UniProtKB/Swiss-Prot annotation:
The gene is nuoA2. NDH-1 is composed of 14 different subunits. Subunits NuoA, H, J, K, L, M, N constitute the membrane sector of the complex. It is found in: Cell inner membrane. This is NADH-quinone oxidoreductase subunit A 2. Keywords: Cell inner membrane, Cell membrane, Membrane, NAD, Quinone, Translocase, Transmembrane, Transmembrane helix, Transport, Ubiquinone.
Length: 118
């Protein structure tokens, strides 16, 4: 049982050791001379305009949460699509109920005006 997972375990251990080793090695040999210019926020090669700590409209957060909510739908639909033949009619009905619930949620969000951008 463990032999089947041994290559994956070795790969994860090597990756973690390489990442940690690189960080430790660079912190030991790297120069540490902070200055005002180095500590300034960097915006795509341009001089920063205003503060980096700016308040965003709550609509951005609502859209982001809705995206995550409906994006998780794809996470649940993918395994169902892979196992579609094995699950049969029960799996089809189960996913149908899941999609209907998500669709009702989408209609609710739409009616509440969360998707309006004014």
């Amino acid at each position: 049982m463990l032999g089947a997972y041994l290559p994956i375990i070795v790969l994860v251990v090597v990756a973690v050791l390489f990442g940690c080793g690189s960080l430790i090695f660079s912190s030991l040999i790297g120069q540490k001379k902070p200055s005002v210019v180095k500590m300034a926020p960097y915006e795509c090669g341009c001089e920063p305009v205003g503060s980096a700590r700016e308040r965003f409209s709550i609509k951005f957060y609502i859209i982001a949460m809705l995206f995550i909510l409906f994006d998780i739908e794809a996470v649940f639909l993918y395994p169902w699509a892979v196992l579609f033949k094995r699950l049969g009619m029960f799996g089809l009905m189960e996913m149908g109920v899941f999609i209907v619930i998500l669709f009702v949620g989408y209609i609710y969000v739409w009616k509440k005006g969360a998707l309006e951008w004014e």
